[in-house]
Each structure stands twice: as C-alpha cells, then as structure tokens.
Amino acid sequence: MASIRLLPSCIVLMFLARSSLCYFITIDAHGEECFHDKVTSGTKMGLIFEVAEGGFLDIDVKIIGPDQKVIYSGERETSGKYTFAAHMDGTYNYCFSNKMSTMTPKVLKFSMDIGEAPKDTSKEDNAGHDKLSEMVSQLSEAMTGVKHEQEYMEVRERIHRSINDNTNSRVVWWSFFESLVLVAMTLGQVYYLKRFFEVRRVV
C-alpha cells in the first residue's frame, strides 16, 4: 500500500525533477547575450545549444562560475552539449557572443537543464522511498534528454530545409540568367547577320 500511495507523488516528481526550458533568441552582429541560474553546490547543469540561422551558423560560448572561473569556453561552434556539476553555491552565467560577425545576426536555440540539488542521505528515514525517487529522477532525466534530441532534430531539419530552399532558389535564378544570356546572344547574332547581308547587298 505504501508503494501505491507514493505513486501520485512519483508521477509529479517525474515532471518536476528537472528544470528545463528551451529558448529561441536573436543575437545581433557584435552582440552578446548572457543568462544566469542560481544553484547549490553539486547540482548537475547541462547546456545544450544550436545555431538555427545566420551567417556560417557559428557562435562563441562561455560558462562562468560564481567565482568568475571559466568553466567552459568555445569559439565559432555550431552546436554543442556541455554537462557539469556546480562546484560551489552561487550564480552561474552562460553567454553567447556574436562579436566575430560584422553584419549578420544569429538565431540561437538553447536550453539549460538543471537537476535536483543533492540531498543529505544521512537524514533519510525511508530507504525504499529514496530509491524510488532516484529511479524516477533518472527516468525523468532520460525523458528530458529524448525531448531535447527531438527538438534539436527539428532545428537541424529546419536548417537543412533552409539550405535546400536557398540552393534551389539560386539554381533557378542562375538558370534564368543563363536563359537571358542565351536569348541575348541569339538576338545579337541574328542582328549581326542581318546587318552583314544588308551591307553586302548595298556593295
């Protein structure tokens, strides 16, 4: 009966065990956008990002801890995943920089997954409940990972579709340009031959 009574709370825990939201942002040329989350020491954090539109689809990324220590830094990255455990209590900042771009804004999709804060297991008086909560938390983490994979597959599909559309558009315009050149050359040759025979007739 205890397991049955715990089931509703476990279902709620499965959806609340991890804090995770996805965002689309636009970063102007020479611009930088920073975000922050306040967590306790030992909390697992995972940054996932992908450039959806703009230029060469690259961005500079940096994660900075509360002590101003650089935890992760990457330059001209198209996409990435970085997971780490908070080494101390405080506010963690993660910044996306488009300062390398001279005129092209970038559209970026990102999410920061924040796990549960570590618990003091010495104060737990119900080993079965603790084990069940841990299993539900792991399941929630796996479901969140699958969700993000699906979302970023959609972003990649959007990028590839945009590239294909641009390529097809360029092919169509190039074919149209070639047709105009061919028509112009044909008309030029006809005009030249007509003038040539008119001159010979006069002579």
From Swiss-Prot:
Record topological domains on the Lumenal side: 23-170
Protein name: Transmembrane emp24 domain-containing protein
Function statement: Could have a role in the budding of coatomer-coated and other species of coated vesicles.
PROSITE patterns the UniProt entry points to: GOLD
Subcellular location: Cytoplasmic vesicle membrane
Pfam family name, one: EMP24_GP25L
Record's GO cellular component terms: COPII-coated ER to Golgi transport vesicle; cytoplasmic vesicle membrane; endoplasmic reticulum; endoplasmic reticulum-Golgi intermediate compartment; Golgi apparatus
Species this protein is from: Nematostella vectensis
SUPFAM superfamilies membership: Supernatant protein factor (SPF), C-terminal domain
Keyword line: Cytoplasmic vesicle, Membrane, Protein transport, Signal, Transmembrane, Transmembrane helix, Transport
Cytoplasmic topology ranges: 192-203
Ribosomal protein found in the keyword field: no
Domain GOLD: 32-114
Membrane topology of the entry: Single-pass type I membrane protein
Statement: the UniProt record of this protein carries the keyword Zinc: no
Membrane-spanning parts: 171-191
